[in-house]
Amino acid sequence: MAQEKNTEEQIIEAARKIFVKRGLDGARMQDIADEAGINKAMLHYYYRSKDKLFEIVFNEAFSKVVTPLGHILEGTRPIEEKIKEVIDHYITGISQVPYLPIFILSEVNQRPEIMIKRLNAQPSFGSIMNFMKEVIEAGKNGKIREVSPIQLFLNIVSLCIFPFVARPLVQGIFQQDNVQFDLLIEERKKMAADVILAWLKP
């Protein structure tokens, strides 16, 4: 049983690497088997198709970062508090699965309809839409500056995601090792929140 669990974990880890590198369309089951150090027959014993594997890898990564946002955005707390917590959680989550932004962007470019359908099906999607309505109402009531909730969404996502997407460039240009980069990311939580909240001041 322990051996089976270990083999499954090896396969998932191998699939993650191959999907990030090549996307769903470019990945082959043989590539995943080779990466996992097993034969193709054994891979098919555990997982019948690469679509099933992709679903597992996607949901595993996505659930760590995006799914909990629904709980953060629900409730009656001030918008400012929600934004601070969203940014903190988002950056922390991506730090744990740093391949996720490139993974999603790659699939959005290759198969936009399918990826958008997947994103819309996530449990947190409704909470995100409700929060955007909340932003509109808060702007009308003078609690925050009147802004487009879409612009707010784009600003938060870009401030959080870009450093991870550009990590090789940032570390290369500024000669940062991994420890220094991790410190930069930790500092970015407050910086990103400060930028967004300053912009939202009425």
Which residue stretches match the model-derived regions?
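Short, amphipathic alpha-helical "lid/cap" segments that border enzyme active or binding sites
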Residues: 12, 66, 84-87, 153, ...
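Hydrophobic alpha-helical connector segments
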Residues: 71-102, 149-153, 186, 202
